[in-house]
């Protein structure tokens, strides 16, 4: 993936410790948010005040909505799939009185829609991946002018088998992320 980060200036943000055990991120500032956008937002705001990072790296699991996706991916487009105020004339995913439906970061990558439900059937908003936290994290980083980087490991296909697949693939994703991103990062900063 060739993306490198400095452990001293980077904050790792992960929903659950079983997605990336603390021992695998030794030497890094890491916080666990808990599940969902509100938990993610509260934890990230507190962590930014405490650590004052130059960049935030979000790692976690995600369900794939596009056939054939597997492994570890960079995500650069973020949507909020459960914001639904269409009855008042706003587009699905649009927060009322805000212009942006999508948050984009630098570079090429996949899209991820976040919402406060574990997806086991395709949602109405089209995206490559689904998760439960990334949109909130990306939005906070944009508002605070902090570089945001997101890596997602495909744990399931966001279908009827998603719950069982998710738990089986967490360790594989953590090992891959640690090997490709964390273990090599002290050599060059992003």
Language model regions located:
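Extreme N-terminal starter segment of soluble prokaryotic enzymes
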Residues: 3-11
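Glycine-rich phosphate- or other oxyanion-binding loops that anchor nucleotides, phosphorylated ligands
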Residues: 17-189
């Amino acid at each position: 993936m060739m993306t490198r980060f400095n452990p001293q200036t980077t904050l790792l943000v992960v929903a659950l410790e079983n997605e990336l055990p603390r021992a695998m991120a030794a030497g890094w500032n890491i916080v666990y948010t808990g599940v969902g956008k509100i938990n993610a937002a509260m934890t990230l705001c507190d962590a930014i005040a405490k650590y004052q990072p130059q960049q935030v790296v979000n790692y976690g699991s995600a369900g794939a909505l596009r056939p054939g996706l597997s492994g570890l991916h960079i995500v650069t487009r973020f949507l909020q799939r459960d914001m639904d105020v269409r009855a008042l004339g706003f587009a699905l995913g649009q927060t009322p009185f805000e212009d942006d439906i999508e948050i984009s970061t630098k570079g090429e990558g996949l899209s991820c829609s976040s919402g406060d439900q574990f997806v086991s059937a395709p949602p109405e908003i089209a995206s490559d991946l689904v998760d439960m936290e990334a949109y909130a994290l990306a939005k906070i980083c944009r508002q605070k002018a902090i570089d945001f980087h997101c890596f997602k490991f495909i744990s399931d296909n966001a279908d009827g088998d998603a719950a069982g697949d998710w738990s089986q693939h967490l360790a594989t994703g953590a090992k891959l992320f640690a090997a490709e991103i964390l273990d090599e990062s002290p050599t060059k900063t992003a």
